[in-house]
Amino acid sequence: MTTTVEQTAESHVFEADVARLLHMMVHSVYSDKGVFLRELISNGADACEKLRYEAIETPSLLAADAESRIMLRLDEESRQLVVEDNGIGMRRDEMIEALGTIARSGTRAFMERIAENKAAEGAQFIGQFGVGFYSCFMVAEHVDVISRRAGSEEAWKWSSDGKGSYSVEAANLVEAPARGTRIVLHLMEDAKTYTSRWTVERIVKEQSGHVPVAIRIVDKPGGEPVQITDGTALWTKSKSEVSKEDYTDFYRGLSGQYDEPALTVHFRAEGRHEYTALAFVPGTQPFDMFDPERKGRMKLYVKRVFITDDAELMPRYLRFVRGLIDTADLPLNVSREMIQESPILAAIRKGVTNRVITAIEKLADGESETYLTFWKNFGPVLKEGIYEDYERRAQLMALARFHTSASPEGHRSLAEYVKDAKEGQDAIYYLAGGSLDQLKASPQLEGFRARGIEVLLLTDSVDSFWVVNAPEFEGKAFKSITQGTADLAQFPRLDNQTPPEQDSAGLATFIGFAREKLAGQVADVRASDRLTESAVCLVAPEDGYDRQMEKILQNAGRLQGATKPILEINLAHPVIKAIAAVEDDASYQEDATFLLLDQARILDGERPQDPRKFAQRLARVFERSVRSEG
């Protein structure tokens, strides 16, 4: 075997985003720089788990060293901290990919998130964004990574000072680990404390105490290794043996987040299928929750051997849940295809999903403030289940909380809405749009507010889909207040006013005039019982899409041409009465009619169809008004 290698080191420049990230790390003012150690240990544990998995097919990879471990070596005099694992290791190309580039958007997302938060709070985001390795530059002025892939006859060395470039060269096999990765941190002067056994051991026990790989420490050159954690898998213990702090530490190491879990679900199922599940609902919203791929973050283990974190172990609407499932009912060499098609795993998935939803239901029934925080974080995703999961739709609808016209700043349940509904009200009314402020100012809401009828205010994109897919709740159908007729005549207004008759003061004639002039742009012009303050509004035909749904489909390119809306007119509005009364100036009345349509479009969040004509008509109407006043 060749023990020395003569090869010139290759110099590489970091990607622009990585270079910016490194600059941020080097000049970091994070209050908890010790987070770097948790990240390096977590990476080492992942490498050991990957080796155990590959060794199922290729046992020779383990050779005579089957026990996974992470070794920490301290050298106070040289100001060095070494983190070494005997995991899978890296080839040259893997080293460049893992340490020199970031293929996903984690780097940019991380930096954007940091820009929005105080520096002292930033450490909690490091692992969450997949950039954990770079955190070592918070404490190191230079970093060497020597790695040897299991089963390989080559070893490689990566080096960088974190200032924009790195080098890769072949490593001397005598000095390289027999297998795995050794990270040598040449610490900054003010980071010398990380060569203290007391400091390092405290950090490990606080932040990595439940990593499923034994961790040992050598506190000085030539010293004997001392085990500081035993690598016992926390999920194999009974709940009575695990403290809240233990769960929190494990959750942080597993998820890469630095908050506390809002919910912890830990149980062992026995019977037809035996498995252990440990699932956490995060206390804060993960950055990747709205990733278009909607991938879950649950890990699958078979007999404590990590298999994959890429299986759909939970419904996609629960993708914010972090955790793992460990079962002995699957073979260790289970393939990706077998995982997706396995009836055993389907049964396990169902059982775990039911337990998580039950835990969320208990949270909703008991701790109102805690649940509202949960809902603000995860409600938009959980509502996807109302659309997708027919079996659990009723449960998920009961969990949903909404802003409403009666409680715009609070959160109401559908059960509360139904309980407080007006006598004779057979629908749950809703208004969907882009923002809460826009919805609260919507003209379509006026008639309902005037009659004390509560309306759900829906601002999430998924809302427009599930309200169509969910036929009813407790016998009441969902009805958009921007579609079809309002049918409000049966409900008296709170001020006891009655709407004007259509034929009064020539209003019927004006409606006919407007219907004729706007025939190319609207399906109809009609009197409105939903307007009390605004002059006009747009609504969708009864057999068409809701106004918001139509916009969503158009923006997604899934709708070929929009349907014509209906223009509703408030016959009691002074502007409408004034326009209708000008029967001797058809040109003015026509301009005013088109301006009313453009006004309705603007109120609906749109632009005038023809801005140039809009401006010309507005100028002519202003001119006539000035002349008539003169």
From Swiss-Prot:
TM region(s), chain numbering: none
Region of interest (C), residue spans: 552-630
Annotated stretches, region: A: 1-336
Region of interest (B), ranges: 337-551
GO CC term (a single one): cytoplasm
Subcellular location: Cytoplasm
Keywords: ATP-binding, Chaperone, Cytoplasm, Nucleotide-binding, Plasmid, Stress response
InterPro entries in alphabetical order: HATPase_C_sf, HSP90_C, Hsp90_fam, Hsp90_N, Ribosomal_Su5_D2-typ_SF
Gene Ontology MF terms: ATP binding; ATP hydrolysis activity; ATP-dependent protein folding chaperone; unfolded protein binding
Principal cellular location given in the protein's record: cytoplasm
HAMAP family: HSP90
UniProt record similarity statement: Belongs to the heat shock protein 90 family.
Subunit structure and binding partners: Homodimer.
Function: Molecular chaperone. Has ATPase activity.
Protein name (database record): Chaperone protein HtpG
Origin species: Rhizobium etli (strain ATCC 51251 / DSM 11541 / JCM 21823 / NBRC 15573 / CFN 42)
Lineage: Bacteria, Pseudomonadati, Pseudomonadota, Alphaproteobacteria, Hyphomicrobiales
